[in-house]
């Protein structure tokens, strides 16, 4: 079992993976980081770590076929001008160009990417992706990993297993959803005629994964509208990956309805979902202060009605 990390950097990822392998090679082009790694690895109880000062592309040419069990690579995600990239083609080193060589040296390659990257475009460009992992914590996507394999390459690699995971502060898994792009394309979730007792807002990992229809089927929920990524049900889902709210009232935009809303509260946390206005403009119109125990979702319902859902967190 041999791990090769082609972009060792500070060695954080390497130090977590290396104990799982009998051999572990850290590759880094910056001499200073290699010196730091050589000092730190014995202190981290990783005496088997081999430090190589080389460019990732250069070292890859020296790897014999099947000389590694797993290759890990974390390419730079900024362009020459310093702008963050959203396409895998813009990462350095060029993962698409290196993929055949990496898969020749190892049967499995794990690519760590920016959560800003376009997942579907990356899957199409590589054509050898078997798994996609999106990890969120504290309400924010933190990691995006692509697993590319020889087997996926032989099969076309364009319908990978996508797993969206929410990690809790204590390091445990707070929810996980696995599906394929084909599952999402074929899914036909029920659409609610009206909002029900509970409103469900999917977490960032699910949103990044694009599991908009699959989420409804997985948790036995109904969508509020085909293009509204909010869900509803009369039952409480304890392990829902996202935020859960109890619906207190539904208002439309008639004068009497808005007056009734303001008689209940003049302060709320406001969000828009599939709605033709920004939060700022809507807040001014509704004359609502920010914060408080109430949450209001401005959204579009199944019949096309624009509505305000007054909720409280569960």
PLM regions with names:
Residues 1-314:
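SAM-dependent transferase fold signal centered on methyltransferase-like domains
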């Amino acid at each position: 079992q041999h791990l090769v990390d082609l972009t060792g950097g500070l060695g954080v990822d390497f130090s977590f993976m290396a104990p799982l392998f009998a051999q572990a090679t850290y590759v880094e082009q910056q001499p200073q980081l290699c010196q730091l790694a050589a000092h730190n690895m014995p202190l981290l109880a990783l005496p088997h770590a081999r430090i190589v000062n080389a460019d990732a592309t250069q070292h890859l040419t020296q790897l014999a076929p099947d000389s590694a069990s797993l290759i890990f690579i974390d390419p730079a995600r900024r362009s020459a001008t310093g702008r963050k990239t959203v396409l895998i083609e813009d990462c350095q080193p060029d993962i698409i160009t290196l993929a055949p060589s990496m898969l020749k040296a190892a049967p499995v390659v794990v690519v760590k990417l920016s959560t800003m990257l376009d997942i579907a475009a990356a899957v199409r460009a590589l054509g050898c992706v078997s798994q996609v992992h999106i990890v969120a914590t504290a309400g924010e996507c933190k990691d995006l990993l692509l697993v590319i394999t020889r087997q996926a390459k032989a099969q076309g690699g364009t319908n990978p297993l996508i797993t969206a995971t929410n990690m809790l502060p204590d390091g445990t898994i707070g929810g996980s959803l696995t599906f394929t792009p084909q599952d999402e394309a074929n899914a036909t979730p029920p659409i609610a005629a009206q909002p029900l007792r509970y409103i469900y807002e999917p977490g960032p990992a699910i949103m990044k994964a694009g599991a908009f229809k699959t989420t409804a089927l997985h948790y036995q929920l109904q969508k509020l509208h085909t293009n509204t990524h909010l869900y509803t049900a009369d039952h409480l889902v304890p392990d829902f990956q996202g935020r859960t709210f109890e619906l207190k009232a539904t208002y439309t935009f008639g004068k009497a309805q808005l007056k009734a809303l303001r008689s209940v509260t003049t302060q709320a946390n406001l969000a828009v979902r599939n709605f033709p206005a920004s939060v700022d403009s809507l807040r001014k119109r509704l004359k609502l202060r920010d914060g408080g125990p109430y949450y209001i979702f401005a959204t579009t319902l199944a019949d096309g009605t624009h509505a305000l859902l007054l909720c409280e967190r569960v």
